[in-house]
Curated annotation (Swiss-Prot):
Residues 218-227 have a biased composition (Basic residues). This is Ribosomal RNA small subunit methyltransferase G. GO terms for molecular function: rRNA (guanine-N7-)-methyltransferase activity. Its EC number is 2.1.1.-. Gene3D superfamilies: Vaccinia Virus protein VP39.
Amino acid sequence: MTVEAFISALNDAGITLTEQQIEQFQRYFELLVEANKQFNLTAITDEKDVYLKHFYDSLTVAIYVKALQHQSSTLIDVGTGAGFPSLPLKIAFPQLKITMVDALQKRVRFLQDVVDTLDLKNVSIVHGRAEDIGQNVAYREQFDFATARALARTSVLAEYTLPFVKVGGALLVMKGAAAEQELADGQQALATLGGTLSSAFDFKLPNGDQRVIQVVDKHKKTPKKYPRQAGTPNKKPIA
């Protein structure tokens, strides 16, 4: 996906970027490729692939969950890695208040460099494990939305993310082709943690890759015991 195709595809979806935003995406790409030479941030470094599989893919969640486009929502991105989907969302929709969580200090430093270089406001970067931060009252049940992209299977991902979402908010799960089976396997975890699937959107990226966005509404508080201590959700998923 060329830069021009990226802009055009967003226009077709009703999202118009300013010149400044287009420049911010290009600078983000440059910073990503440069930092990737020092340590592994992503296997995707070709410009056309980054614009499709990182930038455009990240923004698809706002195409289907339009509240992200217009409201000054609080959003936490758990296991953000190189900043996806939260940084593309922040660039495209500056009114969002973003918190990014990652367990690796090198990635946190990279994210801070991007935020500083692009002069992004209302962005917080938290270094640590989701299981630990999810028990911190400063973050627990404080967010309108939580996102996670390719973080873990749904039953595990739910325990990492739903504790951050306030009652009345939603978890936005971004998955590939295996999403339906994962969701079926994760139903007990969602219910236990206070979530209910409200909608799902199946679509394809312009290159034909299958994607699914699942919206999980938070309808009751997460029991205090969740998330369990670091490592436990992955070893012993809620079932």
